[in-house]
Curated annotation (Swiss-Prot):
Transcriptional regulator that controls a genetic switch in male development. It is necessary and sufficient for initiating male sex determination by directing the development of supporting cell precursors (pre-Sertoli cells) as Sertoli rather than granulosa cells. Involved in different aspects of gene regulation including promoter activation or repression. Binds to the DNA consensus sequence 5'-[AT]AACAA[AT]-3'. SRY HMG box recognizes DNA by partial intercalation in the minor groove and promotes DNA bending. Also involved in pre-mRNA splicing. It comes from Delphinapterus leucas. Keywords: Acetylation, Activator, Calmodulin-binding, Cytoplasm, Differentiation, DNA-binding, Nucleus, Repressor, Sexual differentiation, Transcription, Transcription regulation. This is Sex-determining region Y protein. It comes from the Eukaryota. GO terms for molecular function: calmodulin binding; DNA-binding transcription activator activity, RNA polymerase II-specific; RNA polymerase II cis-regulatory region sequence-specific DNA binding. Interacts with CALM, EP300, HDAC3, KPNB1, ZNF208 isoform KRAB-O, PARP1, SLC9A3R2 and WT1. The interaction with EP300 modulates its DNA-binding activity. The interaction with KPNB1 is sensitive to dissociation by Ran in the GTP-bound form. Interaction with PARP1 impaired its DNA-binding activity. The keyword Phosphoprotein does not apply.
Amino acid sequence: MFRIVNGEDYSPAVQQRNILDFGKAPSLLWTDNGSSNDRCETGGNCRESGQDRVKRPMNAFIVWSRDQRRKVALENPQMQNSEISKRLGYDWKMLTEAEKQPFFEEAQRLRAMHRDKYPGYKYRPRRKAKEATEIASRRLFSTVQPNAHRGDLVPLHIQGRLRQGHTFTNGKPVKPLAAHEHKQLTPATGASQQLDKPAPQ
C-alpha cells in the first residue's frame, strides 16, 4: 500500500511516463465503478459519508480535454497543470461548433449510460470548507441577534452605519440615541446601566 518516495520519482522522464500511462490503466480517478466509495470524487478516504457516491458523467469539454491534456503535457513537460488548464480552456473556445460536435455526442452518450446505470442519481455538490464556516458563523449570529430587545445595546462591531448618525441592526434602521439614553454593559454583571442620567425635574 505504501512505498518510499525518492527524488527519482519526480524526474521529467518518470513524470512523462506517468502521463503516458495515465488513463490506460484503470485508476480510481477515472473509474466507472460506483462502489469506489467517493475516493474518485474527493481524493479523500471515503469514510466521511456512509453511502457510496457516484461521479457525475463527463461533459463535452472533459471528454475532449482528457486526451488534449496528455498531449499538451508531453509537448511541454515543464508546464504547470494550471497553465495547461488555461490553455485547454482557450483552445476549446477556439474550436468551431462542428469540431466540438463529436465530443457533445460522446458526452450525451455517456449521460445516457449514466442515467441507465444510476436512475435515481441527483447531483449534490459538496460545500467547500470556507463556505461551511461562513454558514456556521451566520447561523451563530442569527441565533444571537433575535434575542436582542429594542432597548438592549448592540455591540458596535455588529452595527452598520447609515448616513448622518443612523445605524441599522438586522437590516432595520434604528434611531440614534439621545445623550441621556446611552447605556453601557458592566463587565461584572452584563447588566445595562445609565451613563448620562437626565437631571430630575
